């Protein structure tokens, strides 16, 4: 935790001085957990900070099939109303003795399951209010996956790249088109779940 705490201390000072927010980009889930734990320790020392971790849509999804439409996913149906009615943002960032909770990916998933809302959409909404967002390289460096707050106002963010030596290979992958069988399978499953897209699913089935 020492190295991570040292990095966070310096970048938080810079962020507060310049009124910016922080995206902590990692290549591994294990490192995300270390950052979560470090921020929680800083919060317990009295630092007023809101942080959230995000994970990939397909890994976060609680539905049987990744199909983000209210007509085929009960977690997407009425999502925003349920989040507001159950005050999920406030609950996940609940203060105890003046210390703001730092919700883990599991905390977001559990709260989403209980409230029957989409955990991915919930984490994306939390990103808009967070001082620190912890997530994969993809959500800042991949133009097709960059999260809204960074895409809309890149100058308002400080980007911390953990294990930056891994970034060149990942970046080359962003610019190297490829179609994997798993992607085709995922597309087929998603389209098959939506009645109006069954015809498209049948076309994909021919090349599976």
PLM regions with names:
Residues 16-18, 45, 153, 164:
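Secondary-structure transition/capping motifs at alpha-helix termini
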Residues 1-10:
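Walker A/P-loop
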């Amino acid at each position: 935790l020492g190295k991570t705490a040292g990095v966070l201390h310096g970048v938080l000072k810079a962020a507060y001085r310049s009124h910016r927010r922080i995206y902590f980009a990692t290549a591994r889930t294990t490192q995300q957990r270390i950052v979560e734990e470090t921020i929680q320790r800083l919060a317990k020392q009295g630092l007023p900070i809101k942080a959230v971790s995000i994970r990939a849509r397909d890994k976060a999804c609680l539905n049987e099939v990744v199909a983000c439409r209210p007509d085929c996913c009960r977690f997407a149906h009425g999502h925003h109303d349920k989040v507001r009615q159950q005050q999920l943002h406030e609950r996940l960032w609940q203060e105890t003795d003046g210390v703001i909770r730092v919700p883990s990916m599991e905390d977001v998933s559990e709260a989403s399951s209980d409230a029957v809302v989409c955990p991915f959409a919930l984490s994306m909404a939390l990103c808009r209010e967070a001082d620190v967002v912890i997530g994969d390289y993809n959500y800042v460096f991949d133009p097709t996956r960059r999260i809204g707050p960074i895409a809309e106002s890149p100058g308002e963010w400080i980007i911390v790249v953990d294990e930056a030596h891994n970034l060149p290979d990942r970046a080359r992958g962003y610019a190297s088109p490829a179609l994997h069988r798993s992607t085709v399978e995922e597309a087929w499953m998603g389209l098959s779940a939506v009645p109006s897209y069954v015809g498209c699913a049948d076309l994909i089935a021919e090349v599976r």
